[in-house]
Structures are given as C-alpha cells and as structure tokens.
Amino acid sequence: MNRIKAVGYENNELKEKAQLLADQLNLQLDQNADTCLFVTPEKLTLKIRNFSLMFADFSAMTWSKRRGEGKRQGLIRACKPTKGIKILDATAGWGKDAAILATFGADVVMLERHPVMAALLADALSRRNEADIQKMCLSLIASDAISFLHSLQEKDYPDIIYIDPMHPERNKSALVKKEMQVLQQLIGTDHDAMELIELSLSHVKSRVVVKWPQKVKPLLPPDASIDGKTVRFDIYMAQFSSN
C-alpha cells in the first residue's frame, strides 16, 4: 500500500471540509483517489483499495460489549485498569486497546505520532455523545511518544505506560486482521521501540506494559509476563523514584 497522499470526499457538500483537512495534513485534495483519507457525511474514514472503509470508533455501546471478554485478556491482567488510574497509551494506532482500558474506569491518554491515524482518532472522539464521554475517559495527543515523555514534568507522570510497537513479525501471519495489516503498511516498524521502553521506565509511577509477539524475544528482560495465544504482555516495574 502506498503512503496516504490525499484526502477524498463523498460529495461536493463535503469538499470544503475535506480541503481544510488536506491543508492541515499537507495532503492533496483528490475526490477520486482510491487510497486516501475519505470524508463521508457521518465520519472520517480510511479508504484503501480492496478494503471496506475503515474508521476508529469510541462509542460506549461498541466497547461495553467487549468489557466482559476484556476481563479475561492479558491486557487487563497486565495493566489492571481501575477508576482513577492514569494510563498513557504511547502507541495508540486504532485506539482499540485504549478503549478497552477506558471501559474499566481508567483515565486513558492516547499518543499517536502518525498524522493520518491521529486524524482518524480525533474524528472518532469528536463523534462521541455525552453518554460515551461519561462512560469512557479517553483523550488524544497527536505527538511522538518519546518527545512527549521528555516534556513531562515529574508530577504528571502516568501510573502506567502501555506500548504496542509495530513489529515486522506480524506481517507474516495470515491471521492478522485487516486493521493491523493497514496499520503495519501505513506506519511500518517502530525502530525506536527500545528507546521508548527505556525512557518510559523512568517516566512512569508504577509500570510499563509492552505488547509483543508471543514467539519473539523481548527487547528487554521483563519483570513478569502474561502469555496469550499469539501475543504476550511483558511487564516492567518503574525505575522512577521521587526525590
């Protein structure tokens, strides 16, 4: 898949909105592009040839249905999200893991450095109604995680940092979902994952949780791990100590 180079739109009534987005992201405006950010009357989507339109979704109704299965997931067992816990999702992607964590009451801040993915996440947040906002405490910062962590003051360190780096191993599996296939091709491998993990350890109050392919050696020896069928969650205890 080529990099996203254009913003398209469904009808002429949406042209102005699409133009504003194209200007904001420094992309071309092309109504007929077959690979683009695509503006519809309802939402901002990602249009990829041979795929149905893809979009982020943070409606409470969607994610409350997955809360029950979430209790059994390694994600929840590793992060232990509860009301009042502040979690920084340093690699938000489509925001699905962040949404699951938020349904358990955690205050989740998503970081996303890719401008196209950040635009899709921002649009999903803007579509929430009051009930969605009350049930899921989610926010977005369009930023590189390493730069963001360097800018944090000690008093603002999150309780937990969650990292789900892009890994080339995922491209080899036929079972990888279409959203992950697209994300892998759009963003590519996170070559700075080691740097991000090491920095996170000194900028977190409790622990860092890293989602990693089950059969791949961890980047750093973890303090604990929770295994799943295809991935595991490596847990690293904080190296931060307040003066």
From Swiss-Prot:
Give the chief site where it resides.
cytoplasm
Give the reactions, separated by semicolons, that this protein catalyses: guanosine(1516) in 16S rRNA + S-adenosyl-L-methionine = N(2)-methylguanosine(1516) in 16S rRNA + S-adenosyl-L-homocysteine + H(+)
Q: Identify one Pfam family in the record.
A: SAM_MT
Q: Where does S-adenosyl-L-methionine bind?
A: E112, R113, D164
* Gene Ontology MF: a single term: rRNA (guanine-N2-)-methyltransferase activity
Q: Name one GO cellular component term.
A: cytoplasm
Q: What is its EC number?
A: 2.1.1.242
* UniProt superkingdom: Bacteria
Recite the UniProt keywords alphabetically.
Cytoplasm, Methyltransferase, rRNA processing, S-adenosyl-L-methionine, Transferase
| Enzyme class, broadest EC rank | transferase
Xref: InterPro entries = 16SrRNA_methylTrfase_J, SAM-dependent_MTases_sf
- Where does this polypeptide localize? Cytoplasm
Which Gene3D superfamilies does the entry link to? Vaccinia Virus protein VP39 (3.40.50.150)
This molecule's function is given as: Specifically methylates the guanosine in position 1516 of 16S rRNA.
What family does this chain come from, according to its entry?
Answer: Belongs to the methyltransferase superfamily. RsmJ family.
What this protein is called in its record is Ribosomal RNA small subunit methyltransferase J
